[in-house]
Amino acid sequence: MLYLNVEQLERCIQTLSASLSLYQAAEEGSTEQEVFRNAVVKGFELTQETAFKLLKKALKAFGHGARKLETTPIKDLLRMAAVHGLMTLDEVERWFAYRDNRNNTAHDYGEGFAHETLRLMPAFLEDVRHLAGVLKHRLGQDAGE
């Protein structure tokens, strides 16, 4: 049986949450706040990439081939996750929005995209924590106990 280690994802979530708290506590418009905003945007990207790597590993446990998964678009991976009960369809739709935002911020670090990313943070943190919990429960070292 394949076991997933979600510790790296949990660490990314912790770091992203801390960056968001520091951003919110910083003086409005300060350089410090801008630094924390940038940390939130990068943390958002890293947390997503870590989650998608884990999803690929999880989908292998459901019989999907590694080579095929490596070439499968992210949105299709998310749909597959729903088919296997790792996410709900509503969660998949929200993850589509997170992915679209991440793709936009990767090409344009403008303030508008950063503010959109910040707006998504509360829901994203809730969804990624839930995903980590599902993966840990279903495929983690303690799964099935």
Model-derived features: positions:
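Solvent-exposed interaction patches of small proteins and small membrane subunits
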Residues: M1-E145
